[in-house]
């Protein structure tokens, strides 16, 4: 019991020493932060000389949001300080409760020692009483006589008998003496047997009590070993926690180094007004938000781990120390009660043994429960460690991506530096305006520094108050750990705020350059849209022309269908004139006459009157020489007016070729009409004139094939029919 209390005191002293060491480290960190604060202000002022103001870029100065952030941080610190005070009060109450428990345990230990001494004395007295009672019962059968009388009783009884008998005979005396000796021997043997039985029973009871005490000591040793294992596990958990903190600090340092590299690159690019890295402001804000979220998640995880460690420490301490002490007190009190009431009967001893066994089983069950809880906590901590390792891997991936982006930005910077050399001439005019803005910014920075100094003073005053609380509480300073942790987070938050302000300035400059690039791209897009609209207009015009051509085709096909009924009896007047002229020019050529016969569809009698006989295909080779037509076309035309049934098989193929040529002719006629319409519209629009000029040679080439004998539409056929009638 005393060893467990001593272990508790040693652990508490170690915690107090650790807290004192952490306080000294945090004080050194605060002094370093205060000393570096001026250096950072100077660096910022020197950086503002080379950087352009946000007002020149067209944006408002980011002073107001920074002030609001600082105010919000101050409010958070005040809330955290109030929480620290509440925690300190709660911890003080807990410490008082623990001190009360320790005092109670000391009192219980003192009472247990007194009970042990009293039980030992009671055992001795009970043994003496038992020996006296046994002697008295053996001699007189009553327990009222004293032990001195019981010892003298046999000798007095002998003397009295001898005196009463007077002068007795020797044989009677010898017989009486022998009987008395026998009785005395029997009585002595009975006493010895009883004393032996009582001694053996007492020895057995003592051995049982010794075994119980040995078992209790073994249990105590096992509990001590378990306490040591729990302490080792707690130390391992603390080491793991420190490792995770070291890894998170490494990640933060790497991020800070990368941010410093980005700042240097941005300081190089601050002189150029119209150039940027190619990354928009929204993307950088998202990156900043993502980094802030990751930092918050790491902080939350750290707080959760600390809470879990504290909970595990409290649970282990509550399960190990108070329960063990209560069990020991119960066991000892039960032993005292049982020792006080064992010797009258054995049933009480057996009941007490059963109680002790039940209590041992309950203690073992509680021990198993504690082990199960420890295993569960270990598994939970391992899962958290795996999750943290996965998140660290994700952070490393993000860091690699940031490195790649930095390398890409460096390559862009090399290209941008060439452009910056050209803009150096414009910087002299910008410097004059930037100097005024730098002065304004210096004034703002001084105000902010004053506010920061006030904040630091308030923090120092709060630190003094916390130190006073530490002196009042004594060794148990666990609440200062939380306060110092918050101060470290404050310093980190301030550094992050400075970094974010510098980032915002760089992002503003990048936004300007990105806006300019956006304007250029929009101008290009508008130009491309105009070109696309022109092409769309042209395509729509071509589609309209195609629709018109389709309509003309449909009309011409309807005309053809109408004309096909009367085409067998109609021939163009100009064809007949051309045939007659060629007939007389060639001195009444037989071939021309045969062609006229086929053309006009003479009967056999009319041919005999003229002096022509039927000839198979005499006029097919003459057609191209006379009219300039292909042979199949003219053959179809000539065979169109024939009424004899013998000429129909040849006419079918010729009519088919003529139909194809006729469709082509109608298409070209429609194109000529559209060309005329396009020429009329060309006077109003220049673009249509260029399109119509490209189409003109095609139309001329298409018309050259029928230049010798121009065929007309249904109107010419009607005229020819009128002449024939």
From Swiss-Prot:
<feature type="region of interest" description="Disordered">
    <location>
        <begin position="134"/>
        <end position="183"/>
    </location>
</feature>
<dbReference type="GO" id="GO:0005794">
    <property type="term" value="C:Golgi apparatus"/>
</dbReference>
<keyword id="KW-0333">Golgi apparatus</keyword>
<feature type="coiled-coil region">
    <location>
        <begin position="66"/>
        <end position="132"/>
    </location>
</feature>
<feature type="domain" description="GRIP">
    <location>
        <begin position="562"/>
        <end position="613"/>
    </location>
</feature>
<feature type="coiled-coil region">
    <location>
        <begin position="344"/>
        <end position="407"/>
    </location>
</feature>
<feature type="compositionally biased region" description="Polar residues">
    <location>
        <begin position="148"/>
        <end position="175"/>
    </location>
</feature>
<feature type="coiled-coil region">
    <location>
        <begin position="191"/>
        <end position="316"/>
    </location>
</feature>
<feature type="compositionally biased region" description="Low complexity">
    <location>
        <begin position="711"/>
        <end position="725"/>
    </location>
</feature>
<dbReference type="GO" id="GO:0007030">
    <property type="term" value="P:Golgi organization"/>
</dbReference>
<feature type="compositionally biased region" description="Acidic residues">
    <location>
        <begin position="21"/>
        <end position="30"/>
    </location>
</feature>
<feature type="compositionally biased region" description="Basic and acidic residues">
    <location>
        <begin position="672"/>
        <end position="688"/>
    </location>
</feature>
<feature type="coiled-coil region">
    <location>
        <begin position="437"/>
        <end position="563"/>
    </location>
</feature>
<feature type="region of interest" description="Disordered">
    <location>
        <begin position="191"/>
        <end position="210"/>
    </location>
</feature>
<protein>
    <recommendedName>
        <fullName>Golgin candidate 4</fullName>
    </recommendedName>
</protein>
<feature type="region of interest" description="Disordered">
    <location>
        <begin position="311"/>
        <end position="349"/>
    </location>
</feature>
<keyword id="KW-0175">Coiled coil</keyword>
<comment type="function">
    <text>Golgi matrix protein playing a role in tethering of vesicles to Golgi membranes and in maintaining the overall structure of the Golgi apparatus.</text>
</comment>
<feature type="region of interest" description="Disordered">
    <location>
        <begin position="17"/>
        <end position="62"/>
    </location>
</feature>
<feature type="compositionally biased region" description="Basic and acidic residues">
    <location>
        <begin position="324"/>
        <end position="349"/>
    </location>
</feature>
<feature type="region of interest" description="Disordered">
    <location>
        <begin position="672"/>
        <end position="725"/>
    </location>
</feature>
């Amino acid at each position: 019991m005393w060893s467990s209390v001593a272990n508790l005191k040693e652990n508490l002293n170690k915690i107090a020493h650790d807290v004192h060491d952490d306080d000294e480290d945090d004080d050194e960190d605060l002094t370093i932060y205060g000393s570096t604060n001026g250096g950072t202000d100077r660096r910022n002022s020197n950086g503002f000389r080379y950087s352009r103001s946000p007002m020149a870029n067209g944006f408002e100065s980011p002073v107001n949001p920074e002030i609001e952030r600082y105010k919000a941080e101050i409010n958070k610190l005040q809330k955290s300080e109030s929480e620290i005070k509440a925690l300190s009060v709660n911890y003080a109450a807990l410490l008082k409760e623990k001190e009360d428990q320790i005092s109670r345990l000391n009192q219980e230990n003192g009472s247990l020692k007194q009970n042990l001494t009293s039980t030992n004395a009671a055992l001795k007295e009970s043994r003496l009483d038992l020996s006296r009672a046994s002697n008295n019962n053996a001699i007189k059968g009553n327990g009222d006589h004293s032990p001195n009388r019981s010892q003298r009783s046999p000798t007095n009884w002998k003397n009295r008998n001898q005196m009463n008998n007077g002068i007795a005979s020797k044989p009677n005396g010898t017989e009486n003496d022998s009987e008395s000796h026998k009785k005395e021997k029997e009585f002595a043997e009975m006493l010895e047997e009883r004393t032996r039985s009582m001694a053996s029973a007492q020895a057995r009871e003592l051995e049982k009590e010794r075994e119980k005490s040995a078992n209790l000591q073994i249990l105590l040793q096992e509990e001590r070993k378990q306490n040591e294992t729990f302490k080792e596990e707690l130390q391992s958990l603390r080491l793991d926690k420190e490792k995770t903190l070291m890894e998170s600090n490494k990640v933060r340092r790497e991020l800070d180094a990368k941010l410093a590299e980005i700042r240097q690159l941005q300081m190089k690019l601050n002189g150029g007004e119209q150039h940027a890295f190619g990354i928009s402001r929204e993307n950088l804000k998202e990156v900043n938000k993502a980094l802030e979220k990751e930092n918050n998640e790491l902080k939350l995880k750290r707080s959760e781990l600390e809470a879990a460690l504290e909970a595990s420490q409290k649970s282990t301490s509550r399960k190990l120390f108070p329960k063990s002490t209560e069990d020991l007190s119960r066991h000892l009190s039960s032993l005292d009660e049982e020792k006080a009431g064992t010797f009258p009967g054995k049933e009480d001893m057996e009941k007490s043994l059963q109680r002790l066994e039940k209590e041992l089983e309950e203690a073992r069950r509680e021990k198993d429960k504690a082990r199960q809880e420890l295993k569960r906590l270990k598994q939970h901590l391992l899962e958290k460690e795996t999750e943290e390792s996965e998140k660290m891997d994700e952070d490393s991936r993000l860091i690699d991506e940031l490195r790649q982006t930095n390398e890409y930005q460096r390559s862009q910077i090399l290209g941008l530096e060439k452009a910056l050399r050209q803009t150096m001439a414009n910087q002299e005019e910008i410097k004059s305006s930037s100097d005024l803005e730098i002065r304004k910014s210096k004034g703002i920075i001084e105000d902010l520094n004053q506010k920061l100094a006030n904040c630091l003073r308030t923090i120092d005053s709060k630190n003094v108050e916390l130190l006073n609380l530490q002196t009042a509480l004594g060794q148990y300073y666990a609440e200062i750990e939380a306060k110092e942790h918050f101060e470290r987070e404050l310093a980190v938050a301030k550094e992050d705020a400075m970094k974010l302000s510098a980032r915002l300035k760089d992002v503003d400059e990048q936004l300007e350059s990105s806006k300019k690039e956006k304007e250029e791209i929009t101008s290009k897009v508008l130009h491309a849209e105009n070109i696309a609209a022109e092409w769309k207009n042209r395509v729509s015009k071509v589609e309209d022309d195609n629709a018109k051509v389709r309509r003309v085709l449909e009309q011409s096909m309807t005309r053809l269908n109408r004309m096909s009924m009367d085409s067998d009896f109609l021939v163009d007047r100009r064809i007949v004139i051309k045939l007659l002229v060629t007939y007389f020019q060639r001195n009444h050529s037989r071939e021309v006459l045969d062609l006229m016969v086929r053309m006009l569809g003479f009967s056999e009698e009319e041919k005999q009157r003229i002096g022509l006989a039927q000839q198979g295909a005499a006029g097919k080779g003459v057609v191209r020489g006379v009219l300039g037509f292909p042979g199949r076309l003219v053959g179809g035309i000539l065979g169109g007016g024939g009424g004899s049934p013998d000429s129909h098989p040849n006419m079918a193929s010729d009519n088919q070729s003529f139909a194809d040529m006729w469709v082509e002719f109608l298409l070209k006629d429609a194109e000529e009409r559209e060309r005329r319409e396009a020429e009329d519209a060309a006077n109003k629009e220049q673009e249509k004139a260029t399109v119509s000029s490209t189409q003109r040679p095609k139309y001329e080439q298409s018309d050259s094939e029928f230049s010798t004998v121009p065929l007309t539409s249904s109107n010419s056929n009607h005229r020819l029919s009128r002449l024939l009638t």
